[in-house]
Amino acid sequence: MVLIRVLANLLLLQLSYAQKSSELVVGGDECNINEHRSLVFLYNSSFGCGGTLINQQWVLSAAHCDMENVQIYLGLHNLRLRNQDEQIRVAEEKFFCLSNKSYTKWDKDIMLIRLNSSVTYNTHIAPLSLPSSPPRVGSVCRIMGWGAITSPNETFPNVPHCANINILRYSVCRAAYRGLPAQSRTLCAGILQGGIGSCMGDSGGPLICNGEIQGIVSWGDDICAQPHKPVHYTKVFDYSDWIQSIIAGNTTATCPL
């Protein structure tokens, strides 16, 4: 299951916000209002995804979150209450590993978005650093978003929820999901006993370890947070050179094989 959701409701409020948003965490608690300054919401009135601000003009998300006419919301907390620090941008240009936007569940599910204008940092908006090294197995990392907090009967909050999960050995994911290759440019992460995990609509959001974005929510089981059913996250460290090359202006840079 790719962790994306068709939103049933159009955005409400003055500039229209969704009553049911598209990024969340089963088993988490409401995030501190200053904890998710890099978290962004991608929305086009039908679909929603998460993303991560990595500098004033660039957002990182998942390739399967690509959508037309997307608006990018920064500085959000409660989707039904406006705050003065919010900013909205659109995508000026999108970059993918392959020109045909091809990706698999274990490779190249990554999208880099150049915003139409630079973001102004403030109390509720700040970038997240790219990884300096990959996370170790056993590392405790943070997930966050506004999506489903129960599964399979989905309920959605108005505020983002956060939770801690662990980096697991890739062999755990291979045992949980048949057909995976021997190696992958993904991270396997979750709680083995279940009860906590990324869920429907969390796609594109961050996996944060030691203050760095180490993963991008990619896919998991149809029923979220089940025992021995962790989630796959695109391994950002493997794409760091590609990301930095694109940002530096080398728009023909290629992803790792």
From Swiss-Prot:
Q: Which InterPro entries match?
A: Peptidase_S1_PA, Peptidase_S1_PA_chymotrypsin, Peptidase_S1A, Trypsin_dom, TRYPSIN_HIS, TRYPSIN_SER
- Top-level division of the source organism's lineage: Eukaryota
Could you state one GO cellular component term attached to this entry? Answer: extracellular region
Expressed in which tissues: Expressed by the venom gland.
- What are the alphabetically sorted keywords of the record? Disulfide bond, Fibrinogenolytic toxin, Glycoprotein, Hemostasis impairing toxin, Hydrolase, Protease, Secreted, Serine protease, Signal, Toxin
Is this entry keyworded Membrane?
no
- The annotated active site, in chain numbering, is H64, D109, S203
Establish whether keyword Disulfide bond is in the entry. Answer: yes
Q: Using the record, list the residue span of the signal peptide; answer none if the entry has no such feature.
A: 1-18
PTM comment, free text: Partial deglycosylation has not effect on enzyme activity.
Q: Tell me, what is an example of a GO biological process annotation in this record?
A: proteolysis
Q: Which residues are glycosylated?
A: N44, N100, N116, N153, N250
Where found? Secreted
Q: Which Pfam families match?
A: Trypsin
Task: List the EC numbers from the record.
Answer: 3.4.21.-
Q: How is its activity regulated?
A: Inhibited by PMSF.
Disulfide pairs here are C31-C162, C49-C65, C97-C255, C141-C209, C173-C188, C199-C224
What region holds the Peptidase S1 domain? 25-248
SUPFAM superfamilies in the record, alphabetically? Trypsin-like serine proteases (SSF50494)
Share any extra remarks: Negative results: does not cleave the gamma chain of fibrinogen, does not show fibrinolytic activity, and does not induce or inhibit platelet aggregation.
Q: Which family does it belong to?
A: Belongs to the peptidase S1 family. Snake venom subfamily.
Its function, per the record, reads: Snake venom serine protease with tyrosine-specific chymotrypsin-like activity. Hydrolyzes the N-acetyl-L-tyrosine ethyl ester (ATEE). Has weak fibrinogenolytic activity. Weakly hydrolyzes azocasein, Aalpha-chain (FGA) and more slowly Bbeta-chain (FGB) of fibrinogen. Optimal substrates are angiotensins I and II (AGT).
Assembly behavior:
Monomer.
- UniProt protein name: Chymotrypsin-like protease VLCTLP
Which species is listed as the source?
A: Macrovipera lebetinus
